[in-house]
């Protein structure tokens, strides 16, 4: 992605802040059928590796987990805040009329390698961590133990864990 130098952000803590604030990201992969994009919630594990690690899951019915080669390079795109900027907002527009519209946005492109985890124990851990993170702000957070055990077991068998080691 082209980023003008004066807009580039390289502070890892700021990149991680955006990723945490906007966890629904687009996982871009390339497989035998060509390019693919999946919109998935991710949890950032900032302490894993020099740049962190992303964990999540996909439906077992999603061909992603079988079509992408092990340790494939992937791109995960986190979209933050964005908005239109009118030329009318610039004082110079009223003086010189030398202004044009633009769009301001924040986005993080996390490059990494994809690992698939077809293991119920791993998937249970991923779901527990995602649930804990996303239910934390709820007045009465849902817990995995709130679901009937047989139903939860069926749901866990229907998903596959994914992990992206950010490079």
Question: What is each PLM-predicted segment?
Answer:
Residues 1-167:
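Binding-site signature for planar aromatic cofactors or substrates
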């Amino acid at each position: 992605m082209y980023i003008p130098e004066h807009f580039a952000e390289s502070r890892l803590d700021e990149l991680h802040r955006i990723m945490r604030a906007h966890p629904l990201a687009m996982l871009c992969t390339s497989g035998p059928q060509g390019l693919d994009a999946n919109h998935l919630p991710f949890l950032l594990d900032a302490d894993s590796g020099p740049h962190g690690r992303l964990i999540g899951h996909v439906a077992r019915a999603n061909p992603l987990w079988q079509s992408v080669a092990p340790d494939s390079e992937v791109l995960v795109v986190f979209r933050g805040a964005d908005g239109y900027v009118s030329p009318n907002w610039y004082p110079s527009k009223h003086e010189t009329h030398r202004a044009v519209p633009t769009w301001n946005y924040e986005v993080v492109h996390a490059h990494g390698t994809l690992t698939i985890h077809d293991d119920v124990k791993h998937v249970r851990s991923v779901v527990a961590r995602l649930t804990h993170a996303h239910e934390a702000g709820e007045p009465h957070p849902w817990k995995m133990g709130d679901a009937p055990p047989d139903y939860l077991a069926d749901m866990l068998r229907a998903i596959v864990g994914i992990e992206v080691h950010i490079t």
